[in-house]
């Protein structure tokens, strides 16, 4: 079989258009536009590209985008002070600190300093805990974006045997929680997993997030499986590929995400959704 391509670019554009319409309706009703503060410390080239795409997406949907580009020499105390200021700013609904941070700054301390109601990346322990307890508020962007893709393609996940490859805090772990909520029987594999091939071959829904080009051979894929490739790897020849050998996997899967143009655009679209949610649910004046 030839797999159907899950077009993340198109779905992400739909999500962004929906958010833009809601923002226009807010402004027409006399409410303020949502505000997102994006903080970049240092000059990591990859981080600069990610940050630029997030800021552009913000402006496209009509958000107020605030940029804070701090030098590499910024101290942890200075960064925490900025976060405190943004936490107290009523015009800011979301605070995004681009990772990785320079050496000497504690990622965990910084992420925990962001108020949970402004944590639009969904990384704060409070928000992760809410997801674990089946009462999610702001959800980690990549896992939530993947669930949106599955929903928009009307893929019924209940009862599927789902396998997540990679147990990172950003994708793998929260993804496993989203899949449990979506009714899957969920396995998470990691570097200590024995016989990885066995797990892959039994997956109805496979989500791969390890950051290694071609890590999963196409002939491991179960016939008719749904394959979600989160990896974004740039080869020496400049080509961008995923963690799955796409051409071979696409011959066996029923659905597959391409790289680029699959999961990546959904991460930014979900960040935009989260910022609107934070604005409407947590920061708008609530009717008594």
From Swiss-Prot:
InterPro entries: Aminoacid_DH-like_N_sf, NAD(P)-bd_dom_sf, THF_DH/CycHdrlase, THF_DH/CycHdrlase_cat_dom, THF_DH/CycHdrlase_CS, THF_DH/CycHdrlase_NAD-bd_dom. CDD domains: NAD_bind_m-THF_DH_Cyclohyd. Pathway: One-carbon metabolism; tetrahydrofolate interconversion. The keyword Hydrolase applies. The keyword NADP applies. GO terms for molecular function: methenyltetrahydrofolate cyclohydrolase activity; methylenetetrahydrofolate dehydrogenase (NADP+) activity; protein homodimerization activity. Pfam families: THF_DHG_CYH (PF00763), THF_DHG_CYH_C (PF02882). Keywords: Amino-acid biosynthesis, Histidine biosynthesis, Hydrolase, Methionine biosynthesis, Multifunctional enzyme, NADP, One-carbon metabolism, Oxidoreductase, Purine biosynthesis. GO terms for biological process: L-histidine biosynthetic process; methionine biosynthetic process; purine nucleotide biosynthetic process; tetrahydrofolate interconversion. Its EC number is 1.5.1.5, 3.5.4.9. NADP(+) binds at residues 166-168, 232. It catalyses: (6R)-5,10-methylene-5,6,7,8-tetrahydrofolate + NADP(+) = (6R)-5,10-methenyltetrahydrofolate + NADPH; (6R)-5,10-methenyltetrahydrofolate + H2O = (6R)-10-formyltetrahydrofolate + H(+). GO terms for cellular component: cytosol. Catalyzes the oxidation of 5,10-methylenetetrahydrofolate to 5,10-methenyltetrahydrofolate and then the hydrolysis of 5,10-methenyltetrahydrofolate to 10-formyltetrahydrofolate. This enzyme is specific for NADP. Homodimer. Belongs to the tetrahydrofolate dehydrogenase/cyclohydrolase family. This is Bifunctional protein FolD. The lineage of its organism: Bacteria, Pseudomonadati, Pseudomonadota, Gammaproteobacteria, Enterobacterales. The gene is folD.
